[in-house]
Amino acid sequence: MKKNLVKSLAIASAVISIYSIVNIVSPTNVIAKEISNTVSNEMSKKASYDNVDTLIEKGRYNTKYNYLKRMEKYYPNAMAYFDKVTINPQGNDFYINNPKVELDGEPSMNYLEDVYVGKALLTNDTQQEQKLKSQSFTCKNTDTVTATTTHTVGTSIQATAKFTVPFNETGVSLTTSYSFANTNTNTNSKEITHNVPSQDILVPANTTVEVIAYLKKVNVKGNVKLVGQVSGSEWGEIPSYLAFPRDGYKFSLSDTVNKSDLNEDGTININGKGNYSAVMGDELIVKVRNLNTNNVQEYVIPVDKKEKSNDSNIVKYRSLYIKAPGIK
């Protein structure tokens, strides 16, 4: 499961790149893609800030400081009134560009109690090995994912981004969303129908076998990063105080950080944190027990990708040719 999980993560991350590779693209598109990748790589090298509110407060502080510095030309002790002078914000155009959720490290996995799917007895009362068919089975199971924002990027800018948990053997994916501004928890669930066709089982002569199908459930937990680029400005007024005149102000978020921390487009990288916990069906197992010898053999029944249902909430499995214990 862990190897498949890591493989699934790699596949999920590479889907867009693979799509571009297998389709013929014009030289212009190739150049555009290379430029886009270069810009993305350059952004990832820049410093990342974890609280926009702090940057906004810094902008307001600098605004008041610069205002009183100008007033010192007329009132040498103007800076002594720093805590008395106020700022009244009147509007802003702050926004987060390209908010997205990225995996942060490898997830952990813990197998839970199996889900019973079905049971059948097959008896071969002849003197020769015989191929018998088990009955088909169907079961319903609810997959659930819970996502929590543990560290916001600040409450001043509202943004959300979706995240899909794709890594399980059934191919079922669960989608949830994260808030960049609120430490809230989202829980999404969906009922999945698992359809297991009859299996061809070769049974020894004069033998009864027990066939049990069950679904393994797994709890997958991990962490995520909430990333994006923030920009925008705030404007308002500084009310008059004593002899200090009223004044208007405006500052940009780009004014609150070192110029070396800015992306080429003047945006600032931000970084929040979150986690997720998904409980979902993983592998469909058929256990065949020879009741004469009590020997057991287990088989993983793969998903039938050729007969994939149009309904994403239905999983269809393949029919295998299985040798019961006692068959050489």
UniProtKB/Swiss-Prot annotation:
The keyword Signal applies. It holds the Pfam family ETX_MTX2. Residues 1-32 form the signal peptide. GO terms for biological process: symbiont-mediated pore formation in host plasma membrane. It comes from the Bacteria. Keywords: Signal, Toxin, Virulence. One of its GO terms (molecular function) is toxin activity. Residues 33-45 form a propeptide. InterPro entries: Aerolysin-like (IPR004991), Epsilon_toxin (IPR009209). Responsible for a rapidly fatal enterotoxemia. To epsilon-toxin type D. This is Epsilon-toxin type B. It comes from Clostridium perfringens.
